[in-house]
Amino acid sequence: MELLSALSLDDLAASFSKLPVFPLFDVAYYIISILYLKYEPGAVDLSKRSPVASWLCAMLYCFGSYILADVLLGESPIHYFSNNANILLASAVWYLTFFCPLNIFYKIVSFLPVKLVLVGMKEVVRVRKIAMGIHHAHHHYHHGWVIMVLIGWVKGSGVALMSNLEQLLRGVWKPETNEILHMSFPTKASLYGAILFTLQQAHWLPISKAYLIFFFTLFMAVCKIYMTATHSHGSPFAIFESGICYVLFAAANGDHDDHGNHHHHHDDHDVSHSAGKSKEEHNEGTRKRKTKKAE
């Protein structure tokens, strides 16, 4: 904290943490979310065939994190739909993305320089949602650290965690695309961010919430802008994760491999033994037939 104070970032971090996300940043969040929906196979055909189903998918993309978090906390899953301004804005973005004449709106927001700005603005909303999720969970469960992490994670990546439900609305069923089995970078980053914000909420991390929001937003925005500009699907956490997994789980994996090899050798021995036994029985049967023929 002394180093951060020496950098004179107190006012900047405090101002940034209080920066309102509605309506500018929220609109950017809706645009990028629904843009990714349009990239999904069959999404355009669905919007023409069943606009209601397409609109529901768009609402899940925009508000799925709130819905899932409310369900986990035992609250009404449609509570967020009482925010008329947000629903109208998201609906307007959905309509313009799919039905704007000559596809003008889609061409503008998918133009790379514009898209990069919108992607960075979306990460501002994501980090703010993680922080609010931790605060909301702490209000219900003061010492439920796991619950805080879970709600913060869901708030940051709820739409990805609900991808299978959204696919069902589009008439698609791909259980192998489960986000928990194959986490994308935003899902992993939301989980790690939720852990950091929970540690800060528990006063185990010696940094203010304003600083954490500022630096984590900066990290997320830079990573996502770079990945979008380079069309990269890798993860900045890959090296860190591989090292941790090697330290924590490599021995167990080795034991499993040895166990599997032991079974393999045992099976080979059984097969060779059975083959030898069959050969002996065949030779003995041949001798008996020859003896009988001689008699």
Swiss-Prot record:
Region (Disordered): 258-295
Chemical reaction(s) catalysed: K(+)(in) = K(+)(out)
Segments of skewed composition (Basic and acidic residues): 267-286
Recorded GO CC terms: nuclear membrane; sarcoplasmic reticulum membrane
InterPro entries associated with the record: TRIC_channel
Lumenal compartment spans: 1-18, 73-84, 166-178, 223-233
Residues annotated as binding Ca(2+): 74
Presence of the UniProt keyword Ion transport in the record: yes
Binding site for a 1,2-diacyl-sn-glycero-3-phospho-(1D-myo-inositol-4,5-bisphosphate): 122, 126
One of the GO biological process terms: regulation of release of sequestered calcium ion into cytosol
Record has Transmembrane as a keyword: yes
GO molecular function per UniProt: identical protein binding; metal ion binding; potassium channel activity
Membrane-spanning intervals of the chain: 19-39, 52-72, 85-105, 145-165, 179-199, 202-222, 234-254
Subcellular localization, as worded in the UniProt entry: Sarcoplasmic reticulum membrane; Nucleus membrane
Alphabetized UniProt keyword annotations: Calcium, Ion channel, Ion transport, Membrane, Metal-binding, Nucleus, Potassium, Potassium channel, Potassium transport, Sarcoplasmic reticulum, Transmembrane, Transmembrane helix, Transport
Activity regulation annotation text: Channel activity is activated by a change of voltage within the sarcoplasmic reticulum lumen and blocked by luminal high Ca(2+) levels.
Membrane-topology annotation of the record: Multi-pass membrane protein
Superkingdom of source: Eukaryota
Function, as annotated: Intracellular monovalent cation channel required for maintenance of rapid intracellular calcium release. Acts as a potassium counter-ion channel that functions in synchronization with calcium release from intracellular stores. Opened by a change of voltage within the sarcoplasmic reticulum lumen.
Oligomeric and partner information: Homotrimer; conformation seems to be controled by binding to diacylglycerol (DAG).
Database matches in PANTHER family: TRIMERIC INTRACELLULAR CATION CHANNEL (PTHR12454), TRIMERIC INTRACELLULAR CATION CHANNEL TYPE A (PTHR12454:SF3)
Family to which this protein belongs: Belongs to the TMEM38 family.
Protein name per Swiss-Prot or TrEMBL: Trimeric intracellular cation channel type A
